[in-house]
């Protein structure tokens, strides 16, 4: 379904590329937005959950009598009450070696992580439901807990009886002659990296409101989600609701970042409760619940090894990615969403490495399940690749820019060892731009002067490539069979105004603005005459979800195709009205005009009026109507690229690290709206700073989460947001009509690696290197004293033999 990317005549970029103010902002910033918790319906009841206080325990008894008898309580359910409706939910995405697991809606017999839903209570108010939850008696017999994925995967205590070996996923692959690369290597560098466990922590937590109308057998579900059509499918797949009689509505959503790209047990229970009670039921989680049970992200143990020649040219890479997957697979992605992407997609990155071998494993543990979060899989993989590249630079005694230049891909199209084609890119240009922006020689002088004064500055860089526009073609290129496609409807009325209905909903990305910009240029009409419904209801256009940096590419592609179909009809009628050939008609600035005869023109509004009301203006064989629904699904993956450089100042006494400035270079093809793109860069990088320096979901030895509020879980605030300098490079994609690529995840993909590299650069006078995030003050102070908590494996063979990979020919560490 790829669209032709050349138009005849060419479409003028009048609105695309402009800093058009976001049309949705006035409504949202003045408090006129309508989020999930703003929506109420007559007669609604409120739901709360009794959640497991234990990480792993046998349920020996549940006493709900007192809660059931409490005034105002309408329903108290345990797993026994819902078995007749649903056996549980399962993930659908495919990945080699992924083992099926069922997540119960309410824990049955065994609880497997702190925060797992055990009992549902529905009452006339939230307060009453919470009070009733306190009256539920829960008797547990504690079982052995496994929290470390390294112990779990090696036969530790069984975390989930469905997977007695604790393996949620395991796979391997090899491309090129990896053994030869390592046998002939002049240098081998290796390291183990551990990005910590983090939360997406959207400003708006999860929630839903189910309204089942029993007289018509119809369900309406409002839900804070990134994937409303997937939620609708799950209502049918797991609960038996008729899709044709179900509507899922996604209202204004206060952030998602991947966490809301799942279906959760709570979201399936509300429709069941509403159907049972014949009244609406609402559930909105509090922050503690969100941090306990809203899916976790990014924690992996990534072991990576480079083989390099005498000049530092990398000839082979081996990667082992072990994810702490938690107690279950999260639908739809499974725990493969982290380890598979880290191992299979990221090890070569922007570098021309001819041979690659990888193993990915997902360990089942007694923690909240692992889910998607901005940069999923890419963040950990980029951290390992880019940090080890700095290790190689130190070994070769060259700058971090130079070592990357020696290895970067320079000619396109380029095919990586896995067979994935990169049609275009600006990999070298990004490295050069970053070095120029930071003025590297000047920084080195300033760093030296600061050290003499007892201050420690560090520079960290990270360059990346990001697959964007998640599509069926992209999944097929990586060996998966999952289907992604979307549709959009574009309708022009008789006055020339346009309404767009997109299948992709927004969580603050600015879809209403960017999609209108795309249509404005295709149709040649003012931006202000276009309104956009961005996926608010499944009654409209279809969407596979606002995930994977796909909105501008996929939703934009759908709008582009539908608008272009309208454009062709406008051109046909305008040519007839102006007595010209269609090839000579240009649509621009609200007018249809003849090339070379500016005075010969007619307003597009008049052309639209003729289409609707005056058949005398039609050419022969013309069919009425100015409304089209078009689908879009790119046949091959496309990639944006870029890089970030951070300068930090490190205090060796307190261990505090301050980010002084961020330099960002982004190539996402043709930029629709620079202001929106830069907002995405800033937001993603600041999230990366949080992950790099202080965000961490911490468990104690019993499996209790210690960070259950924003007092403990430290998200970045404006006081840690540094100044930015941003530069754009435009390498248009040959896969899209407008040349656009996706970029929403790039900041969090790359920034944590830049943070770690900057901290390690600042630590270099102390002879220490950190391999673990976050780089907390405690870890930094210990590093200044030569104490490093995380050490790489001394025997690599066990990592590979576990998955059937031969032991390495070279030693694990070759660092000077």
From Swiss-Prot:
Pathway: Alkaloid degradation; nicotine degradation; 6-hydroxypseudooxynicotine from nicotine (R-isomer route): step 1/2; Alkaloid degradation; nicotine degradation; 6-hydroxypseudooxynicotine from nicotine (S-isomer route): step 1/2. GO terms for cellular component: cytoplasm. Nicotine dehydrogenase activity is inhibited by tungsten. SUPFAM superfamilies: CO dehydrogenase molybdoprotein N-domain-like, Molybdenum cofactor-binding domain. Due to the increased usage of tobacco products, the industry generates solid and liquid tobacco wastes containing high concentrations of nicotine, which dissolves easily in water leading to the contamination of the ground water. Nicotine-degrading microbes can be used for bioremediation of these nicotine-polluted environments. It is an enzyme of class 1 (oxidoreductase). Mo-molybdopterin cytosine dinucleotide binds at residue 745. GO terms for molecular function: iron ion binding; nicotine dehydrogenase activity. Disulfide bonds: none annotated. Heterotrimer composed of a large subunit (NdhL), a medium subunit (NdhM) and a small subunit (NdhS). Belongs to the xanthine dehydrogenase family. Component of the nicotine 6-hydroxylase, which is involved in the degradation of nicotine. Catalyzes the hydroxylation of the pyridine ring at C6 to form 6-hydroxynicotine. Can use both L-nicotine and D-nicotine. This is Nicotine 6-hydroxylase large subunit. It comes from Paenarthrobacter nicotinovorans (Arthrobacter nicotinovorans). The lineage of its organism: Bacteria, Bacillati, Actinomycetota, Actinomycetes, Micrococcales. The gene is ndhL.
């Amino acid at each position: 379904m790829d669209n032709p990317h050349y138009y005849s005549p060419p479409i003028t970029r009048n609105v695309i590329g402009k800093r058009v103010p976001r049309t949705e902002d006035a409504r949202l910033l003045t408090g006129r937005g309508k989020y999930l918790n703003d929506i109420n319906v007559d007669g609604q009841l409120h739901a709360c959950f009794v959640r497991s206080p234990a990480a792993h325990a046998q349920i020996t008894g549940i006493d709900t009598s007192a809660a059931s008898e409490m005034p105002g309580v309408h329903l108290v359910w345990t797993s026994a009450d819902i078995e007749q409706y649903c056996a549980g939910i399962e993930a659908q995405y495919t990945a080699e070696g992924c083992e099926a697991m069922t997540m119960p809606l309410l824990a049955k017999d065994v609880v497997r992580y702190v925060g797992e839903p055990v009992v549902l209570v529905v009452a006339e108010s939230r307060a009453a439901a919470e009070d009733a939850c306190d009256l539920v008696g829960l008797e547990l017999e504690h079982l052995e807990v496994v929290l470390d994925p390294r112990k779990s995967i090696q036969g530790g205590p069984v975390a989930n009886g469905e997977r007695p070996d604790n393996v949620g996923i395991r796979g391997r692959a090899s491309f090129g002659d990896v053994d030869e690369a390592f046998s002939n290597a002049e240098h081998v560098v290796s390291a183990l990296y551990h990005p910590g466990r983090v939360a997406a922590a959207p400003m708006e937590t999860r929630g839903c409101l189910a309204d089942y109308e029993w007289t018509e057998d119809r369900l309406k579900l409002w839900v804070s989600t990134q994937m409303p059509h997937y939620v609708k499918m799950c209502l049918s797949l797991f609960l038996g609701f008729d899709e044709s009689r179900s509507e899922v509505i996604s209202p204004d959503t206060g952030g998602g970042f991947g966490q809301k790209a799942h279906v959760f047990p709570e979201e399936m229970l509300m429709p069941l409760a509403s159907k049972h009670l014949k009244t609406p039921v609402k559930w909105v989680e509090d922050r503690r619940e969100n941090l306990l049970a809203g899916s976790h992200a990014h924690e992996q143990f990534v072991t990576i090894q480079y083989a390099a020649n005498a000049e530092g040219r990398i000839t082979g890479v081996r990667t082992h990615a072990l994810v702490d997957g938690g107690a279950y697979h999260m639908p739809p992605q499974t725990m493969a969403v982290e380890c598979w992407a880290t191992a299979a997609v990221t090890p070569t990155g922007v570098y021309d490495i001819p041979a690659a071998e990888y193993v990915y494993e997902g360990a089942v543990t007694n923690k909240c399940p692992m889910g998607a979060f901005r940069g999923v899989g890419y963040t950990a993989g980029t951290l390992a690749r880019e940090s080890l590249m700095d290790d190689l630079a130190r070994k070769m005694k060259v700058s971090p820019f130079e070592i990357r230049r020696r290895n970067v891909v320079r000619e396109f199209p380029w095919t990586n060892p896995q067979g994935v084609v990169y049609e275009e890119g600006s990999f070298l240009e990004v490295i050069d731009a970053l070095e120029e922006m930071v003025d590297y020689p000047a920084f080195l002088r300033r760093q030296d002067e600061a050290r003499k004064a007892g201050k420690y500055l560090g520079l960290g860089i990270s360059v990346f490539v990001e697959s964007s526009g998640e599509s069926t073609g992209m999944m097929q290129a990586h060996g998966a069979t999952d289907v992604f496609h979307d549709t959009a409807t574009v309708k022009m009325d008789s006055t020339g105004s346009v309404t767009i209905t997109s299948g992709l909903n927004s969580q603050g990305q600015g879809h209403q603005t960017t999609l209108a910009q795309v249509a404005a240029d295709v149709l040649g009409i003012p931006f202000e005459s276009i309104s956009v419904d961005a996926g608010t209801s499944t009654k409209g256009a279809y969407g596979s979800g606002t995930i994977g940096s796909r909105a501008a590419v996929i939703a934009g592609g759908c709008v582009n195709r539908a608008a272009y179909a309208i454009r062709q009809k406008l051109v046909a009628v305008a040519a007839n009205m102006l007595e010209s050939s269609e090839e000579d008609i240009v649509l621009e600035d609200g007018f249809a005009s003849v090339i070379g005869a500016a005075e010969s023109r007619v307003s597009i509004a008049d052309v639209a009026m003729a289409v609707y009301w005056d058949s005398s203006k039609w050419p022969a064989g013309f069919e009425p109507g100015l409304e089209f629904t078009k689908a879009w699904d790119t046949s091959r993956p496309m990639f944006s690229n870029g890089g970030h450089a951070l300068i930090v100042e490190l205090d060796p006494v307190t261990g505090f690290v301050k980010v002084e400035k961020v330099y960002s270079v982004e190539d996402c093809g043709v930029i629709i709206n620079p202001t929106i793109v830069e907002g995405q860069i800033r937001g993603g990088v600041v999230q990366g700073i949080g992950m790099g320096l202080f965000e961490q979901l911490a468990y104690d030895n019993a499996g209790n989460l210690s960070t259950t509020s924003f007092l403990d879980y430290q998200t970045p605030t404006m006081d840690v947001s540094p100044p930015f300098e941003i530069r754009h490079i435009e390498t248009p994609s040959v896969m899209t009509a407008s040349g656009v690529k996706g970029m929403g995840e790039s900041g969090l993909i790359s920034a944590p690696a830049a943070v770690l590299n900057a901290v390690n650069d600042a630590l270099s006078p102390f002879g220490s290197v950190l391999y673990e995030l976050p780089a907390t003050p405690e870890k930094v102070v210990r590093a200044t004293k030569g104490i490093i908590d995380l050490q790489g494996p001394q025997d690599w063979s066990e990592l590979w033999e576990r998955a059937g990979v031969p032991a390495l020919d070279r030693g694990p560490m070759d660092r000077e």
